Regions:
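Generic recognition of long tandem-repeat/solenoid scaffolds
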Residues: 18-24
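Active-site mouth of glycoside hydrolases
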Residues: 6, 10, 21, 29-32, ...
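Secreted/periplasmic carbohydrate-active enzymes, especially glycoside hydrolases
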Residues: 1-16
Length: 211
């Protein structure tokens, strides 16, 4: 019974909730098992062995590499990193192992410029996410899009790529507006993709302590 519920044969159609269960497009219960693609579209310091160099969060890793090797090299490095850190072969291997879902943590800065007061889209993040979702469809694993690093940060720690360990998403109107715009864009882009099982709107959000 359990084996049937975790089988990739149940990766079929839009997921929906029925009481305390999750069901597929055939109204069959499915138990989700899977991997998280941490450090790919949102670099996290603890996943790097950077020694004394500060890689505590994505923006600091980017700064360290720029200072060490220059802007041109840094741009090439991150492009190659994202092209190779996760590939279709990784998704195929997860399917081979019998899992039925993949969580994809993302950083807003791959999708939007940081320009204050403006909404300027970037192609890189959407292209990478499109590819991963297509791999998931081909390999029959539900994809879960996780906004791990929201505009300004939603947790106030290194995991959300915040600038100063404050959840400024909740403290700054511009960041809040960017966050809403990003989710509208993502929802509209993938609304017809049944393989997108769901969305983690904000990973580990915490309101600022005003006291």
């Amino acid at each position: 019974m359990i084996y049937e519920k975790i089988s990739r044969e149940r990766v079929n159609g839009f997921l929906h909730a029925v009481g305390r269960t999750i069901q597929n497009g055939n109204n069959e219960e499915i138990l989700l098992t899977g991997w998280g693609l941490g450090n790919w579209l949102n670099p996290e310091g603890y996943m790097w062995k950077s020694g004394e160099v500060s890689f505590s969060r994505g923006r600091e890793a980017e700064k360290s590499i720029r200072e060490l090797a220059g802007e041109e090299y840094a741009q090439k490095f991150w492009k190659q990193f994202r092209a190779n850190y996760i590939t279709k072969k990784d998704i195929e291997k997860m399917a081979e192992f019998g899992y039925n879902s993949v969580r994809i943590p993302i950083n807003w800065r791959l999708f939007m410029e940081e320009t204050p007061g403006e909404i300027i889209w970037k192609d890189e993040g959407f292209t990478l996410l499109d590819h991963c979702i297509q791999w998931c469809k081909e390999c029959k694993l539900y994809a879960w899009i996780d906004l791990h690093a929201a505009p300004g940060g939603q947790t106030g720690s290194n995991i959300d790529d915040s600038e100063d360990d404050l959840p400024r998403l909740f403290m700054n109107d511009d960041y809040y507006t960017k966050g809403l715009a990003l989710w509208r864009k993502l929802a509209n882009r993938y609304k017809d993709e049944w393989i997108v099982g769901g969305y983690d709107l904000l990973n580990e959000p915490i309101m600022p302590n005003d006291g």
